């Protein structure tokens, strides 16, 4: 699961991918769910598209032994369910990866103290009635938070 923010008011959002299916070398189908305000849950389905792949420097590999590089691309995920609360997420992502034999796997950060994002999504959410909100989520540190935003929000969201 990843945690993030939605809208100018920085409402909490949680994103969880339940299924990933390779369509071809550049496209993957994603299924999962979003949760806002801790109670509103919408199932989602969409795609990620790979735009580029990079390798980590030797220095980065020594700090994060479970990361060989990053995959960069764009995404579009449509929520389905109650039309009042569903919409479409779209934007850009990065995902850390590692090579394990002949397999490419999701990267892992074994040193949580580094607070390094291995998965990061930035973009917009568009509601069924056309309302657009900025959104971002990640596996560690929420990207694009306002300067005065507290990462450990006690507001109950």
Residue ranges, per PLM feature:
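Central antiparallel beta-sheet cores of small beta-barrel/beta-sandwich binding domains
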Residues: 1-157
């Amino acid at each position: 699961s990843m945690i993030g923010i939605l809208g100018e008011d920085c409402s909490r959002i949680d994103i969880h991918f339940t299924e990933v299916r390779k369509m071809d070398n550049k496209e993957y189908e994603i299924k999962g769910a979003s949760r806002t305000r801790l109670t509103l849950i919408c199932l989602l389905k969409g795609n990620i598209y790979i735009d580029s792949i990079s390798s980590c420097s030797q220095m980065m590999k020594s700090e994060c032994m479970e990361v060989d590089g990053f995959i960069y691309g764009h995404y579009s995920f449509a929520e389905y369910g109650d039309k009042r609360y569903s919409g479409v997420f779209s934007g850009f992502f990065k995902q850390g990866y590692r090579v394990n034999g002949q397999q490419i796997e999701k990267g892992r950060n074994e040193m949580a103290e580094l607070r390094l994002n291995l998965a990061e999504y930035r973009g917009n959410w568009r509601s069924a009635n056309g309302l657009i909100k900025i959104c971002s989520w990640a596996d560690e540190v929420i990207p694009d938070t306002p300067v005065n935003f507290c990462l450990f929000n006690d507001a109950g969201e």
